[in-house]
Every structure is written in structure tokens, then in C-alpha cells.
Amino acid sequence: MNTSMSWIKMYVPDLDVTAQEYTDAMTLSGTKVEGFEKLDADLDKIVIGQIEKIEKHPDADKLIICQVNIGTETVQIVTGAPNVKEGDKVPVVLDGGRVAGGHDGQKTPGGIKIKKGKLRGVESFGMMCSIEELGSTREMYPEAPEYGIYIFTEDAVVGESAIKALGLDDVVIEYEITSNRVDCYGVLGIAREAAATFDKKFVPPVIKETGNDEKASDYVKVTVEDPELCPRYTARVVKNVKIGPSPKWMQRCLASNGIRPINNLAVSYTHLTLPTKRIV
């Protein structure tokens, strides 16, 4: 059973502890924690930058020189990425910062430190990052290109933390839930336990019923053949469903829990199921 700290804090907003403090206290309270992973452990000094100008490298056909606005200044970065253009907003690791690994997705313990240098005689003061260099994968971020730099949407704010914008400023907690604690099989159960452990207020999700005066029975019939095994089974009808991408916040929520976001229907189903561990 895995949950992210950000998801727990959705239901316990006043929870303000470190991952280690959380792990120790939850284990002592009876909800054993096997361990935790900080998604940004090997990431540092990575901001959102916007490419303002691109020029060809004078001595290398496959390299380009980019002038990148990082909010406080404009820095020059040399790259061989084939997918960037002027106006793109990209993750930029600054001089002295760290990335988790290389383009191949292999993580380096402690990360890779980025220093300013020269590429074929032209100075470069940082590096633009692929999603793999940030320690994640295209499975978790399906909008990322197969080869090249990750491109943010137009609403990304230049100068802000790229780590936070991607939801990588999070901690994934791994629990060992025993069979006598079925109440903790879902995120809501874990959140209730955390609220009790740290003496914080538990804020349950607010569920608003939407729809119209139409009845589901006009479209589908539900028959419970064995009420003892299944005392209740209900159905709702959802019409005009269009398959497409799910909202970014929902994608990030699932990705931080190690679940690949597929489309709006699959992601919505999973996001409804995980808190209660009840089949929807």
C-alpha cells in the first residue's frame, strides 16, 4: 500500500511533519511504514524557463544556442535537443543544481551536478531537462516527448520551481497493512489514522451529487441475485463521455503514487477507487 504525502494532506491539511517524523509516529501508532521515497531527493535548483531566442551553433550542426528567461535573468544554454522552439517553457537546472539521472532513465545515486561550461567553444550556464533527467518517466508523464526536453503548458509561471510544477516535491510512503486493518487499505483510512496519530483535524471529501431528473432505471436494470453476498448494488448513468486527457492535478496525484495516468475515464475511476478501496 503506497500513498503520497500530498494526498494525505488533502484530508489532513494541518499535517506539518517531515517524512521521517511521519514514518516513526505512524509505525508506533500501529500503522507500520516500510519506508519512504522523496521524489525530489536528487533534484536541486530547477526552475521554469522560457526560451526567448534560438541561434545555430557556429561550430556544431546538431547544437543550438538558447537564450532562456528564468525569471530573474536571461541565461545562455547550449543544447542538442531537437524539439524546442522559441516561446517554449522548459525545466532548467541552473549552475550548481542537480538532476536525478540521464536521458536513458537510469538514476544516479545522489544525482548529477550540473556546472557551467563550454560546448564546442560556446558558454552554457545550465541545462534544459527531459522528464527522465528529472527522475520520472513518460509512463507517468504521457505528455512528455519520447526524445527531448519536457515542455510545460502555456500557463506555467517563469521562474517558479519546475519540481513543484511537476508534482515532484512529494514523498511516497510505503505501508505494510495487516489483514486486521482493512480500514487502512484506502487513502482515506490512512488519512484518518494520520489525523488521530498527530491530533489533527480530518477533513473528509465533499461529495456533490450532480445530474438531472432522469432515472438510471430508464437505461439499465440492476438485479441482486444474492442479497446476503451483495446487500446493495447501485448504478448511475453517465452520458456523452469523451475520452481525452485528464486534468493535470489528477495526473500528478496518481503519478506521485506510482500509477500511470492513461485517460480521463481511467484516471477518474482510479482516483475514485483508491481513497476507499471500493470498486466503483
Where are the model-predicted features located?
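Residues forming anionic-ligand binding surfaces in small-molecule and nucleic-acid pockets
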Residues: 161-176, 218-256
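Conserved small/polar residues in nucleotide/adenosyl-binding loops
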Residues: 269-276
